[in-house]
Amino acid sequence: MDQPAAGFPALHFELEQPDRYLTFQGIDFEGNMRRVLAHLYRYIDDPAHGNAFWDRFKARLQAAEAGAATICDKLLLLHSHVYYMVDLFEEQEDEIALADLKTLEEECF
C-alpha cells in the first residue's frame, strides 16, 4: 500500500504483519447479521425466553432498520449486545448460533 487512503494519514512505520482489517470488501455484513438475528429471534420471540430487555432490543432494532435511529444502526446494535447474545446462545447450547455470532464478530466488528 504505497498511498494512504483518502482522509487517512500515512503510516510512519511498516507493519510486520498486516492487520486483519485490510479491507471490508467481500464481507457479507447483511448475511452475517441476518443469520445471527434468525438465531436470536428464535429465542427472544418465544415467551419462555423473551423478556423486557429483549423487547427493548427488538424495538431498537426496528428503529435501526427503519432508519429512524440517528445514533445506532443494526450492526452497532448487534455489536453492543454481543455478550447478551452469547449468554442466551450458551444457555440454549446452540453451537450453530455461537459459530455464526463468532463469524459476525470476527468479520464485521
Swiss-Prot record:
Keywords carried by this UniProt record: Nitrogen fixation
A Pfam family recorded for this sequence: CowN
InterPro entries, alphabetized: CowN (IPR024899)
BP-aspect Gene Ontology terms: nitrogen fixation
Disulphide linkage map: none
NAD listed as a keyword: no
Superkingdom field: Bacteria
Role according to the record: Is required to sustain N(2)-dependent growth in the presence of low levels of carbon monoxide (CO). Probably acts by protecting the N(2) fixation ability of the nitrogenase complex, which is inactivated in the presence of CO.
Assigned protein family: Belongs to the CowN family.
Protein name, UniProt field: N(2)-fixation sustaining protein CowN
Organism in which the protein naturally occurs: Xanthobacter autotrophicus (strain ATCC BAA-1158 / Py2)
